[in-house]
């Protein structure tokens, strides 16, 4: 499959890339190789093969999510330097307007 040089020149023009004649010829050959590879891939029979995103099977490396009981409110507030109405009390960091 051959790709005319005008295609490479047209693509370069659309991308606003200035190519020399040598670069146009080089990219034309490279494009021919890519299209030949695609043609070769199209010849393979892949019926019955499931599509995949990665060649290795995906596995979950995270632990299973098992609910556990946490601290009670009293336990959480037991080491707080200041508390008020069952909540942590902190110094004021935002001034009123």
From Swiss-Prot:
Q: How does it assemble?
A: Heterotrimer of A, B and C subunits.
Which keywords accompany this UniProt record? ATP-binding, Ligase, Nucleotide-binding, Protein biosynthesis
Top-level lineage group: Bacteria
InterPro entries on file? Asp/Glu-ADT_sf_sub_c, GatC
As its record notes, the protein acts as a catalyst of: L-glutamyl-tRNA(Gln) + L-glutamine + ATP + H2O = L-glutaminyl-tRNA(Gln) + L-glutamate + ADP + phosphate + H(+); L-aspartyl-tRNA(Asn) + L-glutamine + ATP + H2O = L-asparaginyl-tRNA(Asn) + L-glutamate + ADP + phosphate + 2 H(+)
> EC number(s)?
6.3.5.-
Please list which residues make up the signal peptide.
none
Q: Which family does it belong to?
A: Belongs to the GatC family.
Question: Lineage of the source organism?
Answer: Bacteria, Pseudomonadati, Verrucomicrobiota, Verrucomicrobiia, Verrucomicrobiales
Which Pfam families is this protein grouped with? Answer: GatC
**Record bears the keyword NADP:** no
Q: Which GO terms describe its biological process?
A: glutaminyl-tRNAGln biosynthesis via transamidation; regulation of translational fidelity; translation
- What gene, per UniProt, encodes this protein? gatC
Q: Which Gene3D superfamilies match?
A: Glu-tRNAGln amidotransferase C subunit, N-terminal domain
**Polar residues bias located where?**
70-88
Q: Which GO terms fall under molecular function for this chain's record? A: asparaginyl-tRNA synthase (glutamine-hydrolyzing) activity; ATP binding; glutaminyl-tRNA synthase (glutamine-hydrolyzing) activity
Q: What does this protein do?
A: Allows the formation of correctly charged Asn-tRNA(Asn) or Gln-tRNA(Gln) through the transamidation of misacylated Asp-tRNA(Asn) or Glu-tRNA(Gln) in organisms which lack either or both of asparaginyl-tRNA or glutaminyl-tRNA synthetases. The reaction takes place in the presence of glutamine and ATP through an activated phospho-Asp-tRNA(Asn) or phospho-Glu-tRNA(Gln).
**For the region Disordered, what residue ranges are annotated?**
68-97
Q: What is this protein called?
A: Aspartyl/glutamyl-tRNA(Asn/Gln) amidotransferase subunit C
């Amino acid at each position: 499959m051959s790709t005319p040089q005008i295609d490479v020149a047209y693509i370069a023009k659309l991308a606003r890339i200035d190519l020399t004649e040598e670069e146009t010829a080089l990219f034309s050959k490279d494009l021919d190789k890519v299209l030949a590879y695609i043609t070769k891939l199209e010849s393979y029979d892949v019926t019955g093969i499931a599509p995949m995103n990665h060649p290795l099977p995906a596995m979950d490396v995270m632990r299973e999510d098992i609910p556990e009981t946490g601290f009670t409110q009293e336990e959480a507030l037991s080491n707080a330097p200041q508390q008020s109405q069952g909540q942590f009390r902190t110094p004021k960091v935002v001034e009123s307007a």
